[in-house]
């Protein structure tokens, strides 16, 4: 849709939140992008929801330098406006008499027995005519292509691969989010180059193509 709008297929984007109440489900970078765009379109109010608790302002003791710390950050979009609400979950979408979205029902949550549970007595409505889902990536779609190839999946639902990006099916390789899981485009680019090297070696018996990273490589974290 964004590409078609930029190419001039629409005089005005079909999605316009001017004068509307916007709720964004997800507290990450994608949610911040949604917030910034909504601000520029002139939304009446913008609320960004995050199920996790608000991070600390200080680096946690268990995340020493040079690991990337999980701390409270304010992006350029957040500096411009909007409200961030932490430790909440969306329980219900409410519609008006015309069937259009009018509000979300949210509750505070607490972590119990390995999962987030709503806190009794904390349900409330927040107005919303637009809701954007920015909740992250739960794995590749297990639809026709994956089922037709017959590739195996790992415990997280991603396509399983070995150290050369090869799946259990001869001649089928996987790179990027489909094999790694949710990540950044720089990882997908590096994996794509490495997978191309592996495919070249598979077809030609050897390769001179660079392979920047192994499929098991991970960011420096604890």
Residue ranges of predicted features:
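Beta1/beta-strand and adjacent pyrophosphate-binding region of the FAD-binding site
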Residues: 17-28
């Amino acid at each position: 849709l964004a590409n078609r709008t930029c190419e001039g297929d629409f005089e005005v984007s079909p999605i316009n939140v001017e004068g509307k109440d916007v709720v964004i489900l997800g507290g990450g970078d994608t949610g911040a992008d949604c917030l910034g765009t909504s601000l520029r379109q002139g939304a009446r109010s913008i609320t960004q929801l995050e199920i996790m608790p608000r991070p600390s302002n200080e680096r946690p003791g268990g995340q020493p330098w040079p690991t990337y710390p999980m701390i409270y950050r304010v992006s350029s979009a957040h500096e411009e406006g909007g409200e961030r609400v932490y430790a909440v979950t969306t329980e219900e979408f409410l519609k008006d008499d015309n069937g259009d979205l009018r509000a979300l029902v949210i509750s505070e949550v607490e972590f119990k027995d390995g999962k987030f549970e709503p806190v009794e007595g904390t349900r409330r409505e927040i107005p919303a005519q637009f809701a954007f889902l920015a909740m992250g990536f739960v794995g590749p779609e297990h639809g026709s292509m994956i089922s037709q190839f017959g590739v195996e999946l790992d415990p997280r639902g991603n396509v399983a691969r070995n150290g050369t990006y090869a799946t259990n099916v001869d001649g089928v390789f996987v790179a990027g989010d489909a094999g790694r899981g949710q990540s950044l485009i720089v990882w997908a680019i590096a994996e794509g180059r490495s997978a191309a090297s592996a495919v070249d070696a598979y077809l030609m018996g050897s390769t001179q193509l660079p392979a920047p990273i192994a499929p098991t490589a991970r960011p420096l974290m604890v």
